[in-house]
Design a protein with these regions (language model features):
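Helix-start (N-cap) detector for alpha-helical repeat units in TPR-like alpha-solenoids
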Residues: 32-33, 66-67, 100-101, 134-135
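Terminal, low-structured helical/coil segments at or just beyond the last alpha-helical repeat
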Residues: 4, 120-121, 127-149
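Position-specific recognition of the canonical hydrophobic site in helix A of tetratricopeptide repeat
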Residues: 9, 36, 43, 70, ...
């Protein structure tokens, strides 16, 4: 059932995937991976508040789960709550200081609140950890263009 849910999600059949994740959670309500996948699926459907609640459930089970922290931050970013999002990225970075996703997302929020130079530092650090991380590369190029204009 989990393979089917993941495949549907990969195929962007989020509504169908959601049904499978719900069924799995009825059997395994504490399966952290499924809870997070369910949250991601809700997020992909634009159901941000439901996804936030789902990530909160994951964090109640595992407060140091970096995936749940980063995903919660990404929703807060989408909702333009940049300072709140940064708080969650910082929490993830306290657990895993070399997490390139948390660094780039923190950089994106930092840029949104107007500190482009600091954002570039986060993008550079992410690239030093994973030099093939495309989002970091694109973000640093965009930030540099903004600085020049």
């Amino acid at each position: 059932m989990l393979e089917m849910a993941n495949q549907l999600s990969e195929d962007e059949e989020y509504s169908h995937a959601l049904k499978f994740y719900k069924s799995i959670l009825q059997i395994e309500p504490s399966n952290i991976g499924v809870i997070i996948d369910y949250g991601v699926t809700l997020q992909n459907l634009g159901l941000y508040h439901q996804a936030l609640t789902t990530y909160d459930q994951a964090l109640q089970l595992q407060p140091n789960n970096t995936s749940a922290l980063i995903n919660k931050g990404s929703i807060l970013h989408t909702l333009e709550k940049y300072t709140d999002a940064i708080t969650y990225y910082d929490m993830a970075l306290q657990i895993d200081g070399d997490n390139p996703v948390a660094l780039v997302y923190k950089g994106l929020c930092t840029a949104e609140i107007g500190n482009i130079q600091l954002a570039i530092k986060y993008f550079k650090k992410a690239l030093s950890i994973d030099n093939e991380f495309e989002l970091a590369r694109v973000s640093i190029d965009t930030a540099k263009c903004i600085m020049k204009s």
